Each structure stands twice: as C-alpha cells, then as structure tokens.
C-alpha cells in the first residue's frame, strides 16, 4: 500500500488532534502554532540526500496572529516561528514513516536568516531534506531546511534534529 504523499489543512488538523498516527504518537500543534497550511509533497526517497523530502506551504495573510503583536507598527513574522515550522515538519515525517512516540525538537546546527516575512508576502514554502532517519529504539530525524517567501530563500537551517519519545515525563 502506498503512503499518502500530500496533506490538506483539514488533515493536518486531524494530526494536531492526535487522530492521524494514533494516541501518544507524533502530533502537530494546532493553530495558531501550526505554521503551514498544507504539505504539498512528502517522499521517503529523493531530496538533496536521497533520504526523503517534505515540501509545505503557508499562505501569508495580513491578519495572521503574529503580525498584530510582533511588532506594533512594524509587523514581521518572528524568525523562531519559521524555524519551529521546520521542526514540526521533521516530526511529522517521523510519524508518517511509522515512528512511535511524541515529537520533541532536539536542536539545530547553523540557522541563518537573510530576509523577512511581511504582511505583504503571499506564500511561504518550506523544503526539508532528510539527511538521516533513525527508526530503531531511538527514533530521530536529522534534516537540512530552507524557507522561501514568494520564491526567495530567506531562512536556512542545517542539522535540525527531532526525536520521538514514548516517555516524556523524564525529558
């Protein structure tokens, strides 16, 4: 049976409610912290390293929650939200691959911001290239990620790490 290779906003909400991968397993945050509207493509192979890739998108609207508070009179998307979206996507990938446990961001190598998302932007595109996927007792993904606004790359993160944990009380 072939895995589903794209996901609508409604399906992402189902994942956020814990309905997609089963109770206690990988789960996306719900809005407003869910930082993408759809997964355009997700593959086990391909991408820069041949170990899988995710492409997701967020439609930029002037009424997005963060523009009203970051900053008054100078609205800009916080860079940490774009970075969090990248971690969210790596965690989703691990659940999609059948990994068990709750997702936790474990770190990143270099993170670079070379641009900004303003309310006048139209489309954010995230591209996550899996470097390594470990599916043993330890479930972990290591990926490089790129974020574009309207086709222009503005964020790059290397060696993003996300793990799935069956116990988080001692984390």
Swiss-Prot record:
One of its GO terms (biological process) is unsaturated fatty acid biosynthetic process. SUPFAM superfamilies: Thioesterase/thiol ester dehydrase-isomerase. One of its GO terms (molecular function) is (3R)-hydroxyacyl-[acyl-carrier-protein] dehydratase activity. Keywords: Cytoplasm, Fatty acid biosynthesis, Fatty acid metabolism, Isomerase, Lipid biosynthesis, Lipid metabolism, Lyase. Pathway: Lipid metabolism; fatty acid biosynthesis. It catalyses: a (3R)-hydroxyacyl-[ACP] = a (2E)-enoyl-[ACP] + H2O; (3R)-hydroxydecanoyl-[ACP] = (2E)-decenoyl-[ACP] + H2O; (2E)-decenoyl-[ACP] = (3Z)-decenoyl-[ACP]. Necessary for the introduction of cis unsaturation into fatty acids. Catalyzes the dehydration of (3R)-3-hydroxydecanoyl-ACP to E-(2)-decenoyl-ACP and then its isomerization to Z-(3)-decenoyl-ACP. Can catalyze the dehydratase reaction for beta-hydroxyacyl-ACPs with saturated chain lengths up to 16:0, being most active on intermediate chain length. Homodimer. This is 3-hydroxydecanoyl-[acyl-carrier-protein] dehydratase. It comes from Methylobacillus flagellatus (strain ATCC 51484 / DSM 6875 / VKM B-1610 / KT). The gene is fabA.
